[in-house]
Amino acid sequence: MAQELSEKELLKMEVEQLKKEVKNPRALISKTGKEIKDYVEAEAGNDPLLKGIPEDKNPFKEKGGCIIS
């Protein structure tokens, strides 16, 4: 799609995008970093990658074995 547009059209789209982005509220990383860290630590108990999935609720556990007769 970008190849079909002229350079002027591409620059116009970029300016429009930058106008949208400049309206986004900005915050200091020292504040947001702490908020993210606190959230991750608070939710760590519910994270299946950290605590694992119970065997009875694991959708990827093999249902049965192979029977050869």
UniProtKB/Swiss-Prot annotation:
Transmembrane segments: none annotated. SMART domains: G_gamma, GGL. Residues 67-69 form a propeptide. It comes from the Eukaryota. One of its GO terms (molecular function) is GTPase activity. It is a lipid-anchor. GO terms for cellular component: heterotrimeric G-protein complex. Its main location: membrane. It is found in: Cell membrane. Keywords: Cell membrane, Lipoprotein, Membrane, Methylation, Prenylation, Transducer. One of its GO terms (biological process) is G protein-coupled receptor signaling pathway. The modification Cysteine methyl ester is found at C66. A lipid is attached at C66 (S-farnesyl cysteine). The keyword Cell membrane applies. G proteins are composed of 3 units, alpha, beta and gamma. Belongs to the G protein gamma family. PANTHER family: GUANINE NUCLEOTIDE-BINDING PROTEIN GAMMA SUBUNIT. Guanine nucleotide-binding proteins (G proteins) are involved as a modulator or transducer in various transmembrane signaling systems. The beta and gamma chains are required for the GTPase activity, for replacement of GDP by GTP, and for G protein-effector interaction. This is Guanine nucleotide-binding protein G(I)/G(S)/G(O) subunit gamma-T2.
